[in-house]
């Protein structure tokens, strides 16, 4: 019986076809009709969406800040990320700003172009920058202010250029402007159009220092709180030039050639707190200080003041409602300090606030 069973098994094996070596592809073909689709073996790879603009070559990008400073660039990099909020291009060799240089930068808030070689800006270069608030163009070679600046602009700094003209039209519609810095330019009084700054209703700070202007610009906006005109060639302070500046708190006129301040000038600035008239050619203390309610700091050192009256700084009497002086400088004037009456500074409650010294 065992022999019969063994014989049948051997016969069955001998009837089978010869063994064939199969590859992986052969087994895959056999599975085609098994109800298992090939996609279950090789899942479909989803399409990769194209990447957005990458950081420009050699620049650094982080948290919407693109820093391309100190790279020797001769033009604005292309393909800047559209979500850029701050673009720093200072300390390069850019010579011109062209239309399209800032296309798609609708979210840009701050543009820094300090210390380049920019001499030309196309009229429509800043048109795409519909949210720009701060524009820094200092230390370039501009001869005029750029046209068609964004209406959203709040701060403009253009000191150390070659600007000789300030036209009223360049500031038209800039109702959000707060700060304008124009110092160290070859400006003359004739180059500033009358009322050039008047249309900027929120303007709070103007600095036109170290230029060639000989008079205080006319038609300044009443919103001003700080006016810095130090280091110019102004010879006189006219009452009319300060008319309407009711909010002015700080007036800088040091390092000029001022020999006189018209009576009534300070009355036009009723909220003035600081007056800098040091390093001029004054021969007497400006009138109106005693009647000024809020003024606290008066710098008059390095002038030609030879006498000080007992009522030059404080109103008559002791029971007066006036802010106390925190700083009065009179050193380096020909006045002899021992000739000043003791009651002259009766409204000064801190002795160290008054600085006197020998004339050199």
Swiss-Prot record:
| Location of this chain's protein in the cell | Secreted, Extracellular space, Extracellular matrix; Secreted
Q: Which SUPFAM superfamilies does UniProt cross-reference here?
A: L domain-like (SSF52058)
Q: Which GO terms describe its cellular component?
A: collagen-containing extracellular matrix; extracellular space
Single Gene Ontology MF annotation: protein homodimerization activity
User: Can you give the propeptide residue ranges?
Assistant: 17-30
Q: Which residues form the signal peptide?
A: 1-16
Q: Which UniProt keywords apply?
A: Disulfide bond, Extracellular matrix, Glycoprotein, Leucine-rich repeat, Proteoglycan, Repeat, Secreted, Signal
- Main role? May affect the rate of fibrils formation.
**Assembly and interaction partners:** Binds to type I and type II collagen, fibronectin and TGF-beta. Forms a ternary complex with MFAP2 and ELN. Interacts with DPT.
Q: What is this protein called?
A: Decorin
Q: Which organism is it from?
A: Bos taurus (Bovine)
């Amino acid at each position: 019986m065992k022999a019969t069973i063994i014989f049948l098994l051997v016969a069955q094996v001998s009837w089978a076809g010869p063994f064939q070596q199969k590859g992986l592809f052969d087994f895959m073909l056999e599975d085609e009709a098994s109800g298992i689709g090939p996609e279950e073996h090789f899942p479909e790879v989803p399409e990769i969406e194209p990447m957005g603009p990458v950081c420009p070559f050699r620049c650094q990008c982080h948290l919407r800040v693109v820093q391309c400073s100190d790279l020797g660039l001769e033009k604005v990099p292309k393909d800047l990320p559209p979500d850029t909020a701050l673009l720093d291009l200072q300390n390069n060799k850019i010579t011109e700003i062209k239309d399209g240089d800032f296309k798609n930068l609708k979210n840009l808030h701050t543009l820094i172009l300090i210390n380049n070689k920019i001499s030309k800006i196309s009229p429509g270069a800043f048109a795409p920058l519909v949210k720009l608030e701060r524009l820094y163009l200092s230390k370039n070679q501009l001869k005029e202010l750029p046209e068609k600046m964004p209406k959203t602009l709040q701060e403009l700094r253009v000191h150390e250029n070659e600007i000789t003209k300030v036209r009223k039209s360049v500031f038209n519609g800039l109702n959000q402007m707060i700060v304008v810095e124009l110092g160290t330019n070859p400006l003359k009084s004739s180059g500033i159009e009358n009322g050039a700054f008047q249309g900027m209703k929120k303007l709070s700070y103007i600095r036109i220092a170290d230029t060639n202007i000989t008079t205080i610009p006319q038609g300044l906006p009443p919103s001003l709180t700080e006016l810095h005109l130090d280091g110019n060639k102004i010879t006189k302070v006219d009452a009319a030039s300060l008319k309407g500046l009711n909010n002015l708190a700080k007036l800088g006129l040091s390092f000029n050639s001022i020999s006189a301040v018209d009576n009534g000038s300070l009355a036009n600035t009723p909220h003035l707190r600081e007056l800098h008239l040091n390093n001029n050619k004054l021969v007497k203390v400006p009138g109106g200080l005693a009647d000024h309610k809020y003024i606290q700091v008066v710098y008059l050192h390095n002038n030609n003041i030879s006498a000080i009256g007992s009522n030059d700084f404080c109103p008559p009497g002791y029971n007066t409602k006036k802010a106390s002086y925190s700083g009065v400088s009179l050193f380096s004037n020909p006045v002899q300090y021992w000739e000043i009456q003791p009651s002259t500074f009766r409204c000064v409650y801190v002795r160290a606030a008054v600085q006197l010294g020998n004339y050199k």
